[in-house]
Amino acid sequence: MSKKVQAVLSGLVLTGALLMPAAGPAVAVEPVAAKAIPSGATKTLTAKTLQVDFQYQETGYWCGPAATRIALSARIAAPSQQQLANELPTTTNGTDWIGQVTRVLNNHLGTGWYETKEMPNDPPTQGQRDLLWNDIVLDIDNNYPIVANIVAPASNHPPGYPNYTIYHYFTVIGYDSADMTVLIADPAGFAPTATYWLTFNQLATLIPPKGYSA
């Protein structure tokens, strides 16, 4: 039984931060209006954010272990990045596939909640976008952060990223449906803050052709 069915029944309804020179197609990056970054768990009528134990990635290719650790820390005392790198496994080339993250998340939490969601279409289809937003809301409402595998060309970067294509993993730890934004915990350290808001539209364009664990 999928977690979506379970949720309804219960009434609950980089690959290593690697850098590669590439121009990529032009994408209009939507800036997020200045808004406060919450320091922990918050909940309003339109938004929810989760408390996590944040760590920057300890090597240039451990974004997968670091993002996985951030997600686990919302629910348990998370293991070290080294342990998670061994379990995924992660090499000097990074973490190959988001499905490895899904497996490790479920193993540590003793659950089948997390599923691997692929987004092979670039740009994503409306159905893929709708599923991503629904997954974000459902997971965050149930205190499960989402881990996303992204490909960010120079024309479509989150805050502070260098002018190269970035293959990376980061963690979604909140959302705000009032302005369709998502709160990102980013282990790379490119941005001036550990967490920052992205528009949902930008997140949806960063994930293809990779995927996410939700």
Show which residues each predicted segment covers:
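Active-site-adjacent structural segments surrounding the nucleophilic cysteine of cysteine proteases
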Residues: 2-107, 152, 160-163, 178
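Conserved active-site-adjacent core of cysteine acyl-enzyme catalytic domains
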Residues: 29-31, 36-37, 83-214
